[in-house]
Amino acid sequence: MFALLKIASCRCESLLGIAPMKRMLINATHAEEVRVALVTGQRLYDFDLENRTREQKKANIYKGHVTRVEPSLEAVFVEYGAGRQGFLSMREIANTYYKADPRQTTNIRELITEGTELLVQVEKEERGNKGAALSTYISLAGRYLVLMPNNPKGGGISRQISGTVREDLKNMLASLNTPRGMSVIVRTAGIGRSQEELQIDLQHLLDLWAQIQKTATLGPSPMLVHQEAGVVTRAIRDYLRDDVAEILIDNEQAFGEAYNFVKAVMPNQLDKLKTYTLNEPLFAHFGIESQIQTAYEREVKLPAGGSIVIDQTEALVSIDINSAKSTRGHDVEETALNTNLEAAEEIARQLRLRDIGGLVVIDFIDMTKERNQRMVEAKLREATQSDRARIQFGQLSRFGLMEMSRQRLRPSLEEATGYVCPRCHGTGMVRDLRSLSLSIMRKVEEIALRERHGEVQIEVPVEIAAFLLNEKRHSLVYLEQTSGVRVTVLPHPHLETPDVCSKYTRL
């Protein structure tokens, strides 16, 4: 079942003048954290991560019951099995759950009562002191379609599809055998697919919905009815396109999960699945660890010497552009334009890598010419065209500010791998213990597998040393045996995360 891979270094592609290949890289060598990267050649353009030490509920479906009706909020609170009750707005409640006709009364207490059982889907994860946002309008994502099984008015075509292609898909959508009371959305992956392929995908989703309904009858609320797919399956479902040449996976179990999904849903793509077997870590081989690291940093450097500074606040994300040492231009206006154009491209990339959602305000370097302002706006729109999230743009104001909003697809990278810093009382973020420890482990692996002899010494805070020497002891022993490099972990009582010291010695 497993395809063996002999990889010619991707660095050769650019040297030979070959167009860089698009690849999906799945790193699952550490069970605590599974990472998916999409690269063109050696440039990272999208990134997803699943922290398996934290439960993710988004898109899960639960059987819950109403615990409190709040007329002042026009909402109800639902017990669905999590630690905190979920928030369900009235506009997210399907008419089938109402006790009265909503056209005859606006009194929420007459429409729905405490104790009412309902199927809910998590729309937004819990954040801070806010409970999860729920909806009774279920959506099930397939390869080419999204099924809305209890929303007859929710169908249509992805907003990213336009022109004659949109009209063709509308006609094809109308001819699909969609049951009464349901609706279907065609995803961008549905472009160029036959009606037969779309119908097969629809049938798969209908079968899934039937199973969900059956499971919901098996027990009382609250209960989990349907678990959203893990990051491996989800990434292949959402990101695999015809232009992705291969999927490289460095773990046998993850490969098996991917193989089973692809075989069931898109068997014609099986030849793209390959196991990665080289000694060098997968992400290090493609040179993207340092690019991933930029997604954890406040300041990101631009090629010509400028930088962007990203700050998360309670209300919005602010992004500031600095020209710094940038020299791209003969005068101030040209330097500002060139730096802003570089920044626009990097901002679009960082929004995807960090999975930033909500309101974003960008402070571009001031430009006096309106033509240049329109160029920067156009560049940002162009750079975000491949983003799966819905994005809305404002125009550059006279103060050089540009507002935009980005759909929150899942918890941001910062939320998934960080925690509120106990030393700064929440004014900043640091990577959590496991994430930082695994980052150190990957760096040690990279050095050991490259050098093949000598010793790597790392001085780390006590809690990180405890994690490495207990949770990752077998990994360290295996690394020493396979690389011939001695790895010494030294706990330092005066170091605090994220500070570490490392030293390599040739013996």
Task: Please state what every model-predicted region is.
Residues F2-L507:
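Single-stranded RNA-binding surfaces
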